[in-house]
Amino acid sequence: MKKIVCLAIVLAVFANVNTFSASKKSSGKKSNTSSTQINSEAPQVALKFLKEYTEVLENNTTGIPNDVSNPEDYDVRYIYFKTTDLITERFRNELLKLTIECYSEEDGCGADLITGHQYYDPKLKILSYNSNKGIVVIQGVDMPDFKVKVKVKNVNGKWLVDNSGF
């Protein structure tokens, strides 16, 4: 039952941002994202956040078992979420809460809270950026099927990540 509740919470968090309207038609045209947009601060913040996060996962050498009762002290993801200055407070609080909830589950939450996948590519690039919606799509270099949508938001003149993996 806890797994179902945890999964429902994860899905609710990542489903709260509707990135594409139902009327959007698929076409074979290339994205109209310009290199100027991709090189702007907002998508670069999204890329930096995902690169830092995957680096944290890559360098996780703590050897701490999964049955530790206090992930706040040991879980590298929790520690990263708590200390990074690249995410909004709303997103930080949601991630910290979900990390603890997933940690208490026997099998965790399944998909990663940030990427929405069970795997990741540490080599990343910006695929597209919709400045109107604040949506950045990050793609794996070695695994092009690995794509993560990241929502960015300007808070007091600073671009921050406000959602990811939805």
Regions found by a protein language model. Name each.
Residues 133-135, 147:
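Intrinsic-disorder/low-complexity, polar/charged segments enriched in Ser/Thr/Lys/Arg/Asp/Glu/Gln
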Residues 126-133, 152-158:
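A short, structured loop/turn motif at beta-sheet edges
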Residues 14-20:
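C-terminal segment of classical bacterial N-terminal signal peptides
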Residues 4-13:
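Sec-dependent N-terminal signal peptides
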Residues 145-166:
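Short beta-strand edge/turn micro-motifs at domain boundaries
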Residues 135-141:
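Short beta-strand segments that buttress and anchor functional surface loops
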Residues 22-131:
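Flexible low-complexity loop/turn motifs enriched in small/helix-breaking residues
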